[in-house]
From Swiss-Prot:
EC number(s) on file: 7.1.1.-
The UniProt record lists the keyword Iron-sulfur: yes
Keyword Zinc-finger among UniProt keywords: no
Protein family according to the UniProt entry: Belongs to the complex I 20 kDa subunit family.
Source species taxonomy: Bacteria, Bacillati, Chloroflexota, Chloroflexia, Chloroflexales
Self-association state and partner proteins as the record states: NDH-1 is composed of 14 different subunits. Subunits NuoB, C, D, E, F, and G constitute the peripheral sector of the complex.
Protein name: NADH-quinone oxidoreductase subunit B 1
Catalytic function, reaction form: a quinone + NADH + 5 H(+)(in) = a quinol + NAD(+) + 4 H(+)(out)
Amino acid sequence: MGIEQKAGDMGIVTASLEQVVNWSRSNAMWPLLFGLACCAIEMMGAQGANYDLSRFGMEINRASPRQADLMIVAGRVSRKMAPVVRRLYDQMADPKWVIAMGDCAACGGVFNNYAIVQGVDEIVPVDVYVAGCPPRPEALIDGIIHLHEKVRRMRLDGTLREPVHLS
């Protein structure tokens, strides 16, 4: 007979340390917003009352990368801005995650020229891509939910226990 049966309806929760840490990490992400173009307007809309990102523990945007664990890159990244994005990413504490919001952040979008980075994954590792030009706030929220699922499947050393299959 396991502890689950012995505890009955006492309100006791049994979980591993890894599950508790991942639950707290996924429910209290503090974003560092990097709005570079029109996607930033939709990102701001996602924080309004209609969509309310605070229900995901993201009600406060961090101005300092040392206080953030999630970077949302929204829009095109120029070659001159690339070192700044990398420096801010390096200043974030581990564990840290990145969402590339919009087609420009994911692959350069319509700006296929020498001055624009053809995807922010050339600069920093990206965990979730949110497609659209610009993506709606619902798409950003869907990307955040997918990131939460990924974080909940991580080991304490930062590797995935199992692959994440998104529908």
